[in-house]
Amino acid sequence: MILFPAIDLKGGRCVRLVQGDMAQATVFGDDPAAQAERFERQGFSYLHMVDLDGAFAGKPQNAAAVEAVLARVKIPVQLGGGVRNLATVEAWLEKGVSRIIIGTAALRDPEFTRKAARLHPGKIAVGIDARDGRVAVEGWAETSDITAEELGRRFEDAGVAAIIYTDISRDGLLTGLNIEGTLALAGALKIPVIASGGLASLADVERLLQPDCAKLEGAITGRALYDGRLDPAAALELIARAKTAA
């Protein structure tokens, strides 16, 4: 299992939102690249980044901050936010992003998403953000009538590397992951699923290491790390021990 530390970008700074509300942004740092280096030193093996401004604008808005991170760390980076066309996908891959997350466009333009996955196998993830079981788009500002499972099934044979599933109702609240909902989605799809939204403690990491979570590729954590509620060393040690035992 991979534990992805999150860096969410707003105005070039590291922030965390509560339930996707840009008005409830807490700034945790002015130097995203320094934060990325810190995560790398702590032993994390893969970084999760979101251009929040880009998600709302429909095109990248924090390119300088992302490029600074790519220049400073060696660990792979997955990036989402404002990815709506192939030109954006290819520009980020050329700059060194390891995996691109397509969110809103997966619902609005599924053919683009499938084409991106075909052209760049293993490099495209679909971000499915759900509110009360329904997919939310445009930086979570709009909720559709499509369920997470329905959207995921559209990409079963497209070559998508992963589904990143976020329960918006828990995001940024440190109330624990929606394990039941995440496992239900993972059980319905062939694509590996990454859990996001609410991971708050070492107990959540332990839960993710149980046998019934074996299909999950990993989980994303943000606020718990910034608030000091989750000890990176303890979490990564737990994961390493579980891997050795397996």
Curated annotation (Swiss-Prot):
Q: What is its EC number?
A: 5.3.1.16
Q: In which pathway does it act?
A: Amino-acid biosynthesis; L-histidine biosynthesis; L-histidine from 5-phospho-alpha-D-ribose 1-diphosphate: step 4/9
Q: Can you state which reaction this protein catalyses?
A: 1-(5-phospho-beta-D-ribosyl)-5-[(5-phospho-beta-D-ribosylamino)methylideneamino]imidazole-4-carboxamide = 5-[(5-phospho-1-deoxy-D-ribulos-1-ylimino)methylamino]-1-(5-phospho-beta-D-ribosyl)imidazole-4-carboxamide
- In this protein, the active site sits at 8 (proton acceptor), 129 (proton donor)
GO MF terms, alphabetically ordered: 1-(5-phosphoribosyl)-5-[(5-phosphoribosylamino)methylideneamino]imidazole-4-carboxamide isomerase activity
The answer to whether keyword Nucleotide-binding applies is no
What protein name is recorded for this chain? 1-(5-phosphoribosyl)-5-[(5-phosphoribosylamino)methylideneamino] imidazole-4-carboxamide isomerase
Q: Which organism is it from?
A: Methylocella silvestris (strain DSM 15510 / CIP 108128 / LMG 27833 / NCIMB 13906 / BL2)
Protein's gene: hisA
